[in-house]
């Protein structure tokens, strides 16, 4: 049975409505999927940027902490250096005061004479040379000349060897030297300084840890002494 024009039109409208509905549903499905993908990508980008920002500020925070530690360490080191300088200056002042007192030693002729003989003989033990020249302060020349025989006797009594001692009459120790002598042997190739200053310096180096301990107390963090 043939369809009437009205039926055909009705079928066509029905098909068009179905096609339109299917197209709308497909479009909505595409839109939903696109929106979902957009939201996922947006979330990924947001998270990625958030991580970058967090990493940036974590790095900055670490840099700030490191800078603080460096500054703190530098300040601590500077403070320690200042303390050390003050202590060393104080030790140096103690030694300077000792040097001033050394200048008083030659005023006691008996004490100074015994000291000169001891200094000469000690140096002769180190040299063990047959002929030795003594360099002295010009002010001490006569005194040292009077002590040469005594020094030679003391040396021979202890080492069983003779030694010829003579004073350098052309070159003297500086007048501001506190006292003592220099001994020269082997045509000037060997020289021993036994001035009062050099002896004080030697003793100071040996006793420096004890001097520090006496002035400031023992350092509990220090395992070894100088």
UniProtKB/Swiss-Prot annotation:
Keywords: Hydrogen ion transport, Ion transport, Transport
GO molecular function, one term: proton-transporting ATPase activity, rotational mechanism
Gene3D superfamilies tied to this protein: 6.10.250.1620, ATP synthase, E subunit, C-terminal
Signal sequence annotation: none
GO-annotated cellular components: proton-transporting two-sector ATPase complex, catalytic domain
KW Chloroplast (keyword) present: no
Domain of life of the source: Eukaryota
Ion transport found in the keyword field: yes
Role of this protein: Subunit of the V1 complex of vacuolar(H+)-ATPase (V-ATPase), a multisubunit enzyme composed of a peripheral complex (V1) that hydrolyzes ATP and a membrane integral complex (V0) that translocates protons. V-ATPase is responsible for acidifying and maintaining the pH of intracellular compartments and in some cell types, is targeted to the plasma membrane, where it is responsible for acidifying the extracellular environment.
Subunit: V-ATPase is a heteromultimeric enzyme made up of two complexes: the ATP-hydrolytic V1 complex and the proton translocation V0 complex. The V1 complex consists of three catalytic AB heterodimers that form a heterohexamer, three peripheral stalks each consisting of EG heterodimers, one central rotor including subunits D and F, and the regulatory subunits C and H. The proton translocation complex V0 consists of the proton transport subunit a, a ring of proteolipid subunits c9c'', rotary subunit d, subunits e and f, and the accessory subunits VhaAC45 and ATP6AP2.
Family, per entry: Belongs to the V-ATPase E subunit family.
Official protein name in the record: V-type proton ATPase subunit E
Organism classification: Eukaryota, Metazoa, Ecdysozoa, Arthropoda, Hexapoda
């Amino acid at each position: 049975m043939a369809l009437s024009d009205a039926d055909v039109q009705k079928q066509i409208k029905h098909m068009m409505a179905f096609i339109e509905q299917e197209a709308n549903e497909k479009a909505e499905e595409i839109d939903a999927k696109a929106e979902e993908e957009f939201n996922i990508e947006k979330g990924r980008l947001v998270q990625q940027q958030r991580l970058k920002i967090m990493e940036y500020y974590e790095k900055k925070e670490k840099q700030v902490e490191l800078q603080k530690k460096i500054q703190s360490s530098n300040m601590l080191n500077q403070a320690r250096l200042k303390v050390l300088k003050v202590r060393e200056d104080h030790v140096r002042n103690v030694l300077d005061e000792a040097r001033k007192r050394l200048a008083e030693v030659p005023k006691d002729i008996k004490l100074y004479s015994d000291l000169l003989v001891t200094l000469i003989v000690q140096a002769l033990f180190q040299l063990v040379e047959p002929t030795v020249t003594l360099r002295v302060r010009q002010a001490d020349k006569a005194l040292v000349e009077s002590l040469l025989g005594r020094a030679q006797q003391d040396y021979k009594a202890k080492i069983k060897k003779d030694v010829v001692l003579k004073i350098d009459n052309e070159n003297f120790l500086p007048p501001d030297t506190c006292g003592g002598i220099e001994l020269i042997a082997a045509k000037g190739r060997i020289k021993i300084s036994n001035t009062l200053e050099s002896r004080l310096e030697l003793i100071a180096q040996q006793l420096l840890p004890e001097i520090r301990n006496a002035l400031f107390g023992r350092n509990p963090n220090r395992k070894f002494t100088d």
